[in-house]
Amino acid sequence: MSYFTIQNEDLPQGFTFRPHDKIYDSLWEMMDDGYFPSTIPLKTTINGVDMPSVGWLEVDEGLYDILIDGLDVLRPTDEEMIVSATGWPLEKNRALILNFFRNLRMDIIGTYTLQRSFITIMSIVLFGDQNPRLRRKKRSRVSLGKMLFDLALRMRSKIRRMKLTEVQVTGQNLVKDLCLLHILDLQKRLVTRGTIAEKRFFTAIEQAPCNYEPKRYGMKKKHMNFMFESDRKNLTVHPTLVNLEEHWITFESARERLLDTTFTKDWPVVGSL
């Protein structure tokens, strides 16, 4: 099977399965309402979660291409440079999750092997990376469904610690989004070390009629009106700290445009997802 099944007893008190008629922008929004999916797909998206993770747009194109091509094509020194920057959830530097992502993305190995690999990674998130024997012992005491629920909680906590938004990582594909968090954490470390330049991109949100009545700041004619409160704050921060979350939520066409796979030649990262 290319999915994991959740049982009723796997969910904590106060949670139940998502009704078929309820659709959410993110898995986190679904959980806030006390619901959880009955299945977690390995390769496809979770039913009932509508918005993809736009955080993939922040992954450096060169780094992404390297991960898809495989680390073994690099010179040993370059491979070591990337592997040494791996972090959460790993406590020991290695290419475990990077290789898993490539195998998942390129469909290189069978579904059963992919599932076992993901369970190992999930066990590391929940039970630590230092003692494999102790980790396996703890894993044997917990159902797979409960592990998946706890994994979602850990990932949401990591999103907040990384100061990401729940639009950047929506949980629509929980398996891929775990890889996304790992890759963004890796990329941040590479930027800090000066290995790659910080990626900055600017988006032009297309003009559209808006029913929102913007707040007025002051009475002078030169004062600007803003569609969103975040627009005013964005004028005072560094470009890398600009918050476009309200734009992503409001303008569905902007999300579709940014994630459109027809832009393969112009934007290989998006086209390759």
UniProtKB/Swiss-Prot annotation:
Acts as a weak IFN antagonist. Keywords: Host cytoplasm, Host-virus interaction, Inhibition of host innate immune response by virus, Inhibition of host MAVS by virus, Inhibition of host RLR pathway by virus, Viral immunoevasion. This is Non-structural protein NS-S. It is found in: Host cytoplasm. Signal peptide: none annotated. GO terms for cellular component: host cell cytoplasm. Its main location: host cell. Belongs to the phlebovirus NS-S protein family. It comes from Uukuniemi virus (strain S23) (UUKV). The keyword S-adenosyl-L-methionine does not apply. One of its GO terms (biological process) is symbiont-mediated suppression of host cytoplasmic pattern recognition receptor signaling pathway via inhibition of MAVS activity. Interacts with host MAVS; this interaction weakly inhibits the host IFN response.
